[in-house]
């Protein structure tokens, strides 16, 4: 992938991949100047590449399990996680309001931008280059991504198997209504095991459950 910082010199498609609708609206840009159409295209490329990868690499899994595994990889939180090595949030063109309320770290914006990048690569370099990007930055560490996606369910099954009680406790809520930050703790038999943060209680619980699973895995 070309460095997103170079997008200024790479023409319209490479500007659009990083342009959020809030920026386009604020700057009164022409119609379809944001990255939403590229996101649509990138989503389709991501689906076929991820499907082919899982079909080839997991020959023993039935259709239902493959579908669930694919969902764990292409879901919003996981795609946002995949943007970290690219530092994609740094290069996004956001409206001032979106920028000031944490838009560069918002999972929905990051995951949409990643799909837009895939769409831009497809248009510029064809399917082979887009596939290479997906395999390099997304279709890696599958087991860990599935663990992240299913963290609450997997943790629930683990704790039940140990005949212990699992609960979640909201320990902090901060920020304005449009940009809330929640901190949630995982309690096992009343003892705090891990914490997680997120812009919703559900996201914070998922992160806390994931951290708890990593702790249990390291103890094994």
Model feature map: region roles:
Residues 8-220:
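Double-stranded RNA-binding/processing signature
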Residues 1-3:
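Short, exposed "boundary/linker" segments that immediately precede the start
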